[in-house]
């Protein structure tokens, strides 16, 4: 569901219809320019973070809502809305008490009933929530500030589930809507208030400082810690993104202050401007990966999958996809380069430039006899298309019959769901990417599953690995997870459900008048200051 401009005006005026037009105009122009930050971000069409996983909707939610727990820069969970909390001796009952000072933008207090309703709504669609509900016997309010989650069996990962992809807490009446019906009130308890009156879908959205928000006292760290707001207003300028050169020109002239994803080919221009700064705020970046159809020849043979692992020259792929080596790195851990559980177990296969002779030998051991290997190529995604061409060329160099199947991304997405042989419309290989930060979450990242038909595209199956993945949910400490991560990675690279192609980190660009921006996987609006 998309909110129309008329709907936004109606929603914004409903709570204060007595305001006159002149008073509204005064309110709209009262914010000083030096206390307003203009950020170039993509269009926001879905306002409900439960209705979509789109990054821009999550960024919106981070501004106006709050969460029970938040993850720091090392992917560790910390209380956010929660003050005191504890778990029973048998690890089956968690009690959470809300901290002081929590209030909705409409002036009413946040209650435990709001939290219970929000958890239940989110759990209907969130993968972590579904795990929680499969183990929960009850989620209930104890009093106005306390709620309890009772479990049928221990779930040591519960704080992490609530921190990584847990619910944005909404008012009980909003959270009472089914997840298929979008919440459009945009009333949260977070550090910013959504300005309905100034909303111009497709052009700009405005967020005003919530002067009544009480931040935590801990310093900000990733999504965790205190969310202190030092500016009066943040405006998302959407229209400026229509043309890459226009967006950079707007940054140079001061029309905007922040550009989240500047065009890679224009980074030298930004770098040469003494008034601008480039910084990789999303330090996890994205990981490009190659998925194989484990159900069909030749990749139903582990030897063929291992052959591809040895063949790939990550640097060649990354250069073709992203160009400047300053913004990419090879990846050898199944968890990427930045997770707290990243490790070097069973990574002896990695060799700069790849190992074509080893790959050729392994294809022979797999019984490969010249069968056609179909690589799905997205013609409307340059990085993916270029990477696909490099992989196809490397396969042909060692005598493999590789064929590119070009289509737009939508066509690729449709075809990758087919489990048939290539002669019946199936596929052998496709390349994609994902936020590296998600790879720290074994229990919510479906690409890290090897449970056959329930797994992500490619449908790998390894029961021994899945037993370890289930064990992850019971662990409570990082040291325990680090040890288990090594066991999992040993099996991962023996089986080879996918092949890593590398990590891409593109910096954000912003005016040097801005300070205090927090490195995170999404752009955060608190803590920044404007000189």
Curated annotation (Swiss-Prot):
GO biological process, alphabetically ordered: peptide transport
UniProt keyword annotation of Transport present: yes
Superkingdom assignment: Bacteria
Gene Ontology cellular component annotations, sorted alphabetically: ATP-binding cassette (ABC) transporter complex; outer membrane-bounded periplasmic space
Post-translational modification: Predicted to be exported by the Tat system. The position of the signal peptide cleavage has not been experimentally proven.
Pfam families in alphabetical order: SBP_bac_5 (PF00496)
SUPFAM superfamilies: Periplasmic binding protein-like II
Keywords: Periplasm, Plasmid, Signal, Transport
Signal peptide feature range: 1-32
Principal cellular location given in the protein's record: periplasm
Subcellular location: Periplasm
GO MF, one example: peptide transmembrane transporter activity
PANTHER family, per the entry: D,D-DIPEPTIDE-BINDING PERIPLASMIC PROTEIN DDPA-RELATED (PTHR30290:SF38), PERIPLASMIC BINDING COMPONENT OF ABC TRANSPORTER (PTHR30290)
Function: Probably part of the binding-protein-dependent transport system y4tOPQRS for a peptide.
Family classification: Belongs to the bacterial solute-binding protein 5 family.
Name used for this protein in its record: Probable peptide ABC transporter periplasmic-binding protein y4tO
Lineage: Bacteria, Pseudomonadati, Pseudomonadota, Alphaproteobacteria, Hyphomicrobiales
